[in-house]
Amino acid sequence: MNYELLTTENAPVKMWTKGVPVEADARQQLINTAKMPFIFKHIAVMPDVHLGKGSTIGSVIPTKGAIIPAAVGVDIGCGMNALRTALTAEDLPENLAELRQAIETAVPHGRTTGRCKRDKGAWENPPVNVDAKWAELEAGYQWLTQKYPRFLNTNNYKHLGTLGTGNHFIEICLDESDQVWIMLHSGSRGIGNAIGTYFIDLAQKEMQETLETLPSRDLAYFMEGTEYFDDYLKAVAWAQLFASLNRDAMMENVVTALQSITQKTVRQPQTLAMEEINCHHNYVQKEQHFGEEIYVTRKGAVSARAGQYGIIPGSMGAKSFIVRGLGNEESFCSCSHGAGRVMSRTKAKKLFSVEDQIRATAHVECRKDAEVIDEIPMAYKDIDAVMAAQSDLVEVIYTLRQVVCVKG
């Protein structure tokens, strides 16, 4: 048995956390969630677990007959894309700053604060590939905005194919054979945030009379068979599609940027499944486990069915992994989505300096200013310990090291 069993007054919690730290607050948050009467069998916890807003990051929450919107959160469909290119390290320019600049030009990133200013994190004139992807989203958007007109006043179309802020990134990496990979991390951007925020608030309003009886107001839920349950599922599915297409559009534009710098073909003539991956790690969907149909919410966790490929990034400056799932049913066929934080962003900014950031990322062409100190490698768990703790969940196919990193 590779997991620690945490018993509660209702469902148990199975934690793949051997050799990695778990905060007391995160444990309590997990216990609170496990108290909900509709938890199916047990909650599974990944080794990158840490306290989260609304729900514990690194948790897999199986439910029957209900869904907790705050467990999915506001970054609906957040996840990873990775592509193994036809390039090798020798094909990259000597001056990697040139490549980083080309990627930053190709993909809007960051955010401009203040009214009446053009947001640098959104398109002014979206390119053709963004238009094509928006066409796949348009029918769902029409339903969403007709039923909930509030979503008309959101960043939607002009956020498609953009990176965002925080821990979202685009990286150029090398594997063990010095093959070049593109790896990126983003979600459903402004529209996903608006959908998540609205339905979290709505669940709490709908449960206003009984909200105080819950272990936490963040555990407010929609019951299956209600109108809001159906609407939430439909809205979330749309936001998850937005997130997936958002990453695809960015990948296409990074490929073009890389091609313009190297003057070489970037995509391989034939790409294997393990060499081009697009996976969510913040989402909910219906799945079958232990012979029953249930809803599985993965909050900072990746699906790892037998033979399924996934991406586990380390912190900025650390190793990342392309993995293949082992289909461990006890984890609801899941694995971690990264290294997991050992301290808050606020604490990291107080504890570390720009000089620390420069030293920690000396081998990576990336931003090294005060605004990204919260992403310093020391703010995260040891990725090797995280991988060791989930050796029965996934096997490593490729180990990657970053050489270029773009942050919002």
Swiss-Prot record:
One of its GO terms (biological process) is DNA damage response. Keywords: GTP-binding, Ligase, Manganese, Metal-binding, Nucleotide-binding, RNA repair. Changing R341A: Less than 10% of overall wild-type activity. Shows increased nucleotide guanylation activity. Changing H337A: No overall activity. Abolishes formation of guanylylated RtcB intermediate. Can ligate pre-guanylated nucleotide substrates. Pfam families: RtcB (PF01139). GMP binds at residues 167-171, 281-282, 313-316, 320, 337-340, 407. Gene3D superfamilies: tRNA-splicing ligase RtcB. Mn(2+) 2 binds at C78, H185, H281. Changing R189A: Almost wild type activity. Shows increased nucleotide guanylation activity. InterPro entries: RtcB, RtcB-like, RtcB-like_sf. Changing D75A: Almost no guanylation activity. Can ligate pre-guanylated nucleotide substrates. Its EC number is 6.5.1.8. GO terms for molecular function: DNA ligase activity; GTP binding; manganese ion binding; RNA ligase (GTP) activity. The active site is at H337. It is an enzyme of class 6 (ligase). Belongs to the RtcB family. This is RNA-splicing ligase RtcB. It comes from Escherichia coli (strain K12).
